[in-house]
């Protein structure tokens, strides 16, 4: 699996692009200026960064952005990284921690059981 270096600020940019694909840079800026304290220049810099990293394809006119990598690719990578760093690669330890520490409803527990049963 290819490793993607994605900073938290870049992930915010990617989430907007994934949610509104395709989307222009000005629309991204409009959305994020409402959600963050970032300036338009900061947002454009972050967009340029994800384009240069190869995560986003930019087309003119209007600097329209489309994702090259998927949300699922990033989720898989970040999940593996978390499991490796905090749980010595053990998914069992991660699931045990979630089940022990979180206040899961019966519906959530049922959903987890269904997911596990589907993997058998």
PLM ranges: what are they?
Residues 3-9, 61-80:
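Short, cationic-aromatic polyanion-contact patches
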Residues 11-16:
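Pre-recognition alpha-helix immediately N-terminal to the DNA-recognition helix
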Residues 23-31:
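Short acidic, hydrophobic short linear motifs in intrinsically disordered regions
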Residues 30-38:
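Short helix-coil junctions and helix-kink-helix linkers
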Residues 51-60:
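A short, conserved structural fragment
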Residues 58, 67, 106:
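Short beta-strand "wing" residues that participate in macromolecule-binding interfaces
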Residues 80-120:
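Amphipathic alpha-helical dimerization/coiled-coil segments
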């Amino acid at each position: 699996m290819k490793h993607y270096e994605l900073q938290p600020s870049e992930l915010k940019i990617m989430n907007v692009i994934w949610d509104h694909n395709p989307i222009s840079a000005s629309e991204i800026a409009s959305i994020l200026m409402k959600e963050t304290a970032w300036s338009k220049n900061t947002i454009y810099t972050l967009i340029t960064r994800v384009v240069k990293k190869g995560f986003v394809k930019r087309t003119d006119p209007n600097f329209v952005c489309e994702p090259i990598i998927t949300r699922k690719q990033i989720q898989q990578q970040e999940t593996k990284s978390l499991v490796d760093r905090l749980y010595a690669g053990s998914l069992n330890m991660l699931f045990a921690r979630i089940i022990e520490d979180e206040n899961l409803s019966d519906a959530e527990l049922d959903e987890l059981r269904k997911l596990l049963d589907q993997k058998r």
